[in-house]
Amino acid sequence: MELTSTRKKANAITSSILNRIAIRGQRKVADALGINESQISRWKGDFIPKMGMLLAVLEWGVEDEELAELAKKVAHLLTKEKPQDCGNSFEA
């Protein structure tokens, strides 16, 4: 039972990390770390899930507030309206 709980936490942590990378952009994250963007791609398959499990075992956890904030950011990005292309267009 404890292993299942730990795996669920690990999956939540891994998902949170991957979502944050997606929101910030893989290139920006790589630049901030001083590595090549392709390294981030390699990490996604192996390193990040292992780190998620390590953090879960250490009971690092994912805060509900962090997930809520992440959800708000994603929703904002998805609903962001584009400005009109032409200044002459007017809707009456």
From Swiss-Prot:
GO molecular function: DNA binding
One GO BP: regulation of DNA-templated transcription
DNA-binding region: 26-45
Entry keyword set: Activator, DNA-binding, Transcription, Transcription regulation
Keyword DNA-binding: yes
Keyword check for Transcription: yes
A Pfam family hit: Phage_CII
CDD domains in the record: HTH_XRE
Source taxon at top rank: Viruses
InterPro entries: Cro/C1-type_HTH (IPR001387), Lambda_DNA-bd_dom_sf (IPR010982), Transcrpt_activ_CII (IPR007933)
Record's function text: Binds to two promoters, P(RE) and Pa23 and activate transcription from these promoters.
Protein family: Belongs to the lambda phage CII protein family.
Subunit structure, interactors included: Homotetramer.
Name this polypeptide is given: Transcriptional activator protein C1
